[in-house]
Amino acid sequence: MTDNQEIKPKKLTLGNSKLLLNKSFDSLTGVQSFVNAKSKTLVEVRKSSIGSTTTISLNKERNSLDQTVIDSNKEEFNRRLSILKKAAEQSKLYDSAQISTLSKLASINQSVNSKNEQFTTDKAVEQKQQDIEDTKVEIGTKIVQDDEDIRSQIPNKKKETFAKSLLVGMRTRYGIEAESALEKIGDNKVVVPKIKLEEPKKFKKADLFNMLSDDENGSGRTRSLASIKRAREKEKRKLVSQIPEKVYREVTIPEVIGVGDLANAMSERVADVIKELMKLGILANASQTIDADTAELVATNLGHTVTRVQESDVENVLINDDKVEDLRTRAPVVTVMGHVDHGKTSLLDALKSTDIAAGELGGITQHIGAYRVTLSDCKAITFIDTPGHEAFSEMRSRGAKVTDIVIIVVAADDGIKTQTVEAINHAKAAGVPIIVAINKIDKPDIDIERIKNELYVHEIIGEEAGGDVIFIPISALKKINLDKLEEAILLISEMQDLKASPFGLAAGVVIESKIEKGRGTLTTILVQRGTLRNGDIIIAGTSYGKVKKMINDKGREILEATPSVPVEIQGLNEVPFAGDQFNVVQNEKQAKDIAEYRIRLAKEKKISVTSRSSLEELLLKASGNSKIKELPLIIKCDVQGSIEAIAGSLLKLPSDEIKLRILHSGVGPITESDVSLAHVSSAIVVGFNVRAGTNALTAAEKTKVDIRYYSIIYNLIDDVKAIMSGMLDPIVREQYIGSVEIRQVFNITKIGKIAGSYVTKGIIKKGAGVRLLRDNVVIHAGKLKTLKRFKDEVKEVREGYECGIAFENYEDIREGDTVEVFELVQEQRQL
């Protein structure tokens, strides 16, 4: 048998021999066993948890030791086998007693040998363990040397932070616990402890946490995640327990306040405020408003102090008094008024050398324009051009409110007209100086004195007659006497000593506003006090916003506007009304508060008007006169001033039977929503200088909504007036058509009394209305039931012919009675 052949168990046994026959190795547990013939394990060698290099060297030593033991066992086995063979051959020569004695000797010998073998194996294992211990010491020394080399290259401030990651790297490199391998004492002494071999530990979350933590203390103790979680929860409980002491505030409460605003003023949660309201039996959300009394109860219940203020106090921030030392001379603001086509726009063209009349339909100015003219001596005049048509009286009235001087233009060839008188009344009401410009003096056959005499009737008296009005004959077309007009304006402005402060927050008036596609809300304003700058927050009526851009009357963008300067601004959230006062405020919150206050006032006023109107309708119904018809309209215009002028003119149309109702009005093109509203309310859509979009036109065609376009306001008013006239009930009146004299009365069976009559005048018709007169007193009024000529029924009988007649439900007819015949005729009424 060779050394490489597999050793198989022998059937022949010698007692309890511990002869080593085989070895085995378990790859899962890392255990190598040496087995004897009875499958009893003699030696078990376990794999250590040291690094790969040490493990290989130990395995080599173990294999060499095992091979030595196996070789010695083989030799002993062969020796004993030869002895057994010899004993078997000699057994024939000895008796059983001798064989028994030999067996006992062999057993004793085997026991002694077994003890020797066990001793040899224990010595080998002990030697192997000593070698492993030596290897561990070498590894520990190597770790210390590497650690010192690396630490010497690290700055002092980072050594402690880097130590943890360094030891972990060593542990990975050499396969042992780095924290237990080294213990640093002082700066130079290193003690290498005895290292206990154990299986590699499974990598846990705590190990990851330790590697990522920046513990500068270098503590080797590892905290579990559960411990960390408990510590954090404890910190949270401490924070919760440290609730700050509640602060009670002094709350200012206006007449109406929102729930959310009240909560913010008290620094309370909205939910707490809502709970307090629910205790009072009020269900409200954060966006709803409550009255001052309810708000005071809520604030008091929450421990706050309440100060009540009037809601109108929000506008107190708009009051600014100018200091006398800050006042500076400003340019005069001149308003040009007059009748239609008397030359107001042409006069402005001549003054500022621009042709704006070409852009006006029919030479009629449709909305206010503001212009600034700089004269040759660098003095400036601001002109406001108001329309001359009577429908724009509201706009002209606003123009008079903001002006310093009024120029009334009168055509020398036309004289005083209705709008001229109206302009005079507005100027007188404003209490401003008046200059009368008698225009078109270049035309032949004019009489200036006649114009002056007509103005005297309206208490417009010239200086030459002892009055204070300046008359200047001019020709805007030929530019005659324009310099005299400018001199008169400057003279009056110097006499008035016009001044304003350019400092402080700006204020002024809205001249006009509109919406332009791509630019948004455009508002023309006139600055009256302070200086308006880009970025200012302004409030105008119920509109507010930040000034994003300012453009002057020349179309150039500017950064600021001083008193008497008209500009067009962008940035308001909605279109303000012409004539609204604008003010600059400190912040957007102030502007929003003022706007909300004004909106509430407008709603209350609207509700009051609606309630009064509803009461009037109820009284009419109760009186039996409830046949009131309604004409609903939707008005869309290019500018806000036109909306007011159109609405004012339409509402002035006299009618007790037709109620004109403006469902919606706005600035901008006609939209699809306007068409939808008109469809559900059977309204007419009116567009003034605007058109409907494609979608709106498509919707109007489907729903059969009537859309009408206008460019001249009096055409619009005439059409609406005609529509309202068509809705009026016609007038029914009696039209006399003839007379009949009763000459004889006949009683006919089954028919009754028939009056034999003679037509004395006109014509008599069957079914016509009749009045029976006896001694010139009407004793019956009714209808003609029967009309016969001889025995035939006829429709009419003319004058000079005889006929037979009978009345409906009346037979008290006598000879000599007279019958008047009439028809009921309907006539269309006009407003």
UniProtKB/Swiss-Prot annotation:
**Record region (G4):** 439-442
GO cellular component terms attached to this protein's record: cytoplasm
Q: Where are the transmembrane segments?
A: none
What are the entry keywords?
A: Cytoplasm, GTP-binding, Initiation factor, Nucleotide-binding, Protein biosynthesis
Keyword presence, Hydrolase: no
Cellular location of this protein?
Cytoplasm
Residue ranges for the region (G1) are: 338-345
Instruction: Give positions of region: G5.
Output: 475-477
Q: Which coarse location class describes where this protein primarily resides? A: cytoplasm
**G3: annotated span:** 385-388
**Chain intervals for the UniProt region annotation (G2):** 363-367
List ligand-binding residues for GTP.
338-345, 385-389, 439-442
* Domain (tr-type G): residue spans on this chain: 329-499
Q: Which domain of life is it from?
A: Bacteria
Q: Which family does it belong to?
A: Belongs to the TRAFAC class translation factor GTPase superfamily. Classic translation factor GTPase family. IF-2 subfamily.
What this chain does, per the record? One of the essential components for the initiation of protein synthesis. Protects formylmethionyl-tRNA from spontaneous hydrolysis and promotes its binding to the 30S ribosomal subunits. Also involved in the hydrolysis of GTP during the formation of the 70S ribosomal complex.
Q: What is this protein called?
A: Translation initiation factor IF-2
Taxonomic lineage from the root: Bacteria, Pseudomonadati, Pseudomonadota, Alphaproteobacteria, Rickettsiales
Q: Which gene codes for it?
A: infB
